[in-house]
């Protein structure tokens, strides 16, 4: 033990007496293994980084200030250039085919706002469906993305999410025997709408040809529940044709709603190729006419999609027939193919053409017309113009039947 202690003392004293022979060479910071001096220590210039083609292009191009200020390169395009459709070759080598790109005026933002998530949570919590989701509507980010729920619009889809028909343009699920109706749906729908503090709501439904009444009584009961919870609520109903049963059409029309909507979807000549074989253009006209006869004060509404290959004369003929049965409101929108299994788009109609047809419809005497590439039947249905018309009619005492009268009419039809 004493020997070890003496040895440690010797080593310690030897280390203290080591002579300093010169300055210590600085070690490079790049690695612990090298003993070469760093450029900063020797004063030698650093080696310049090799330039690349990408860097040269960036340096030679416009600056951020040029981009913001604009210039000749950023001048507005002529309509012919702005509306020109672009194509691309897609597919594996040897089997590429030309595809038309979606026009810029049809592109919309991805829905991701907080309000979108809140609305979706409310709907799922009450087991409700919306046509916004089921039909893959491109406007969902706009309609659901308001800063608060009162600014948002959602079209509730009644009677489930499965339709008994198979139209070639629609992405809603189809089945000959969908699940039975939810008896709590009318109450849940009224509850959800009362939570949102909306002033205008749109109800629609899938076609239920498996039911004796097509779901008309279920539809009418939902309207009555909404009016009971909030009599001032303006309700628009977008219904099916009930296989031509006009008594069911009149039943829904007398339920207390404010706007009766039924879509003809396309011109008469293309109806057999676009819609399910059980739906016809003339049958849709009879539905709209029956609704107006049941309630002459009722606003009736329909919608057409453009881009199926319709001609101008066919559109003129469709508008003339719609006016002949007293339709008040018409909308035009661009057909957009949901999946490859659906009918292809024949033409992308430009915004200028949509504006032209809006003016033509108003000149023919339609009360209101919404026309644009992204317009859908229930898109911004509660426009200020329609709301003002309805409120004026209500103030004048021509708003139709009361909730009590509507319930009595439904009860009578049920017996």
Curated annotation (Swiss-Prot):
Claim: Iron-sulfur is one of the keywords in the record: yes
InterPro entries xrefs: Aldolase_TIM, Elp3/MiaA/NifB-like_rSAM, LIAS_N, Lipoyl_synth, rSAM
Ranges where the record places region Disordered: 22-53, 395-415
Bias (Polar residues) ranges: 22-32
GO cellular component entries: mitochondrion
Transit peptide location: 1-32
EC number of this enzyme: 2.8.1.8
UniProt entry keywords in alphabetical sequence: 4Fe-4S, Iron, Iron-sulfur, Metal-binding, Mitochondrion, S-adenosyl-L-methionine, Transferase, Transit peptide
SUPFAM superfamilies associated with the record: Radical SAM enzymes
UniProt domain Radical SAM core: residue ranges: 146-367
Compartments, as annotated in UniProt: Mitochondrion
Binding site for [4Fe-4S] cluster 2: 163, 167, 170
Cofactor(s) the record lists: [4Fe-4S] cluster
Bias (Low complexity): 33-47
Residues given in the record as [4Fe-4S] cluster 1 binding sites: 132, 137, 143, 378
Gene Ontology molecular functions: 4 iron, 4 sulfur cluster binding; lipoate synthase activity; metal ion binding
Keyword RNA-binding: no
Catalysed conversion reaction: [[Fe-S] cluster scaffold protein carrying a second [4Fe-4S](2+) cluster] + N(6)-octanoyl-L-lysyl-[protein] + 2 oxidized [2Fe-2S]-[ferredoxin] + 2 S-adenosyl-L-methionine + 4 H(+) = [[Fe-S] cluster scaffold protein] + N(6)-[(R)-dihydrolipoyl]-L-lysyl-[protein] + 4 Fe(3+) + 2 hydrogen sulfide + 2 5'-deoxyadenosine + 2 L-methionine + 2 reduced [2Fe-2S]-[ferredoxin]
Pathway: Protein modification; protein lipoylation via endogenous pathway; protein N(6)-(lipoyl)lysine from octanoyl-[acyl-carrier-protein]: step 2/2
Cofactor note: Binds 2 [4Fe-4S] clusters per subunit. One cluster is coordinated with 3 cysteines and an exchangeable S-adenosyl-L-methionine.
NCBIfam families with a match to the protein in the record: lipA (TIGR00510), PRK05481.1 (NF004019), PRK12928.1 (NF009544)
Family recorded in the similarity comment: Belongs to the radical SAM superfamily. Lipoyl synthase family.
Name recorded for this polypeptide: Lipoyl synthase, mitochondrial
Organism: Aspergillus oryzae (strain ATCC 42149 / RIB 40) (Yellow koji mold)
High-level lineage: Eukaryota, Fungi, Dikarya, Ascomycota, Pezizomycotina
């Amino acid at each position: 033990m004493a020997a070890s202690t003496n040895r440690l003392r010797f080593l310690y004293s030897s280390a203290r007496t080591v002579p300093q022979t010169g300055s210590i060479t600085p070690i490079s910071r790049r690695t612990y293994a090298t003993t070469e001096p760093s450029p900063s220590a020797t004063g030698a210039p650093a080696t310049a980084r090799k330039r690349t083609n990408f860097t040269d292009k960036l340096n030679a191009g416009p600056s951020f200030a040029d981009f913001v200020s604009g210039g000749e390169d950023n001048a507005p395009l002529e309509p012919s250039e702005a509306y020109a459709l672009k194509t691309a070759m897609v597919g594996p080598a040897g089997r590429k085919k030309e595809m038309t790109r979606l026009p810029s005026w049809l592109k919309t933002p991805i829905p991701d706002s907080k309000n979108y998530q809140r609305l979706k949570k409310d709907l799922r919590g009450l087991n409700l469906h919306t046509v916004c989701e089921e039909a893959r509507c491109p406007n969902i980010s706009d309609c659901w993305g308001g800063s608060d729920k009162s600014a948002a619009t959602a079209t509730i889809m009644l009677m489930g999410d499965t339709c008994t028909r198979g139209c070639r343009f629609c992405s809603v699920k189809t089945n000959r025997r969908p699940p039975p109706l939810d008896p709590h749906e009318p109450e849940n729908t009224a509850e959800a709408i009362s939570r949102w503090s909306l002033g205008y709501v749109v109800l629609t439904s899938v076609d239920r040809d498996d039911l004796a009444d097509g779901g008309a009584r279920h539809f009418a009961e939902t309207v009555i529940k909404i009016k009971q919870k909030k009599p001032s609520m303006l309700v628009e109903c977008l219904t099916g044709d009930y296989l031509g049963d006009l008594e069911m059409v009149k039943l829904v029309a007398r339920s207390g709603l404010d706007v009766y909507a039924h879509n003809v979807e396309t011109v008469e000549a293309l109806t057999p190729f676009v819609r399910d074989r059980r739906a016809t253009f003339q049958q849709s006209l009879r539905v709209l006419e029956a609704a107006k006869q049941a309630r002459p004060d009722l606003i009736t509404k329909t919608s057409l999609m453009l881009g199926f290959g319709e001609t101008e004369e066919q559109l003129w003929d469709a508008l003339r027939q719609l006016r002949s049965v007293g339709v008040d409101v018409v909308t035009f929108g661009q057909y957009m193919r949901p999946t490859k299994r659906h009918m292809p788009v024949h033409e992308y109609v430009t915004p200028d053409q949509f504006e032209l047809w809006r003016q033509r419809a108003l000149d023919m005497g339609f009360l209101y017309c919404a026309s644009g590439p992204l317009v859908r039947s229930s898109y911004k249905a509660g426009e200020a113009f329609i709301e003002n018309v309805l409120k004026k009619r209500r103030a004048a005492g021509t708003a139709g039947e009361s909730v009590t009268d509507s319930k009595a009419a439904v009860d009578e039809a049920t017996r």
